Amino acid sequence: MKFLLDENVPISIKKVIQDNGFEAFTLHDFNMLGIKNGKVVELALNNNAIILTLDSDFLNLNKNLQLKSRIVYIKLHPRDPVKLRKIVDSFLKKYSLKLNNSFKLTLTETDEVYEPL
């Protein structure tokens, strides 16, 4: 399983994902910083990757992109890197078998909302 980290996700999360046995890459790896969310989705689709983001705008993509994409949105304020690592680690252990089809998933410190599409 592959994950594409949106540019707002700390690079340290890449290691958390890799330590759990999954592939992870960033927009920086593709030299594509600053691209629009639709292009991030296209990049993820072309690489069969799940988008991991802190940007709630990904929850409001047009319907066509939503039906194709796999998005994990992490709602965390303030953005504490230690808490973020714990949330991602817990998510990977809990959801890794459910991530094959299109979905939106919102994670917080205390709650999860999984929406298959």
Predicted segments, located by residue:
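Metal-dependent nucleic-acid phosphoesterase active-site entry motif
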Residues: 2-11, 109-111, 115-117
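N-terminal first-folded block
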Residues: 3-47
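Hydrophobic/aromatic beta-strand patches that form the interior of the parallel beta-sheet core
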Residues: 25, 52, 72-74, 105-106
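Ribonuclease/tRNase effector modules and their secretory precursors
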Residues: 18-19, 89-94
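Mid-chain, well-packed structural core segment of small domains
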Residues: 59-91
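Acidic, metal-binding active-site segment of PIN/NYN-like and related structure-specific nucleases
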Residues: 44-62
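Charged phosphate-binding loop/patch that engages nucleotide di/tri-phosphates or the phosphate backbone
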Residues: 95-117
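Small/polar loops that bind or transfer phosphate-bearing groups
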Residues: 5, 53-54, 76
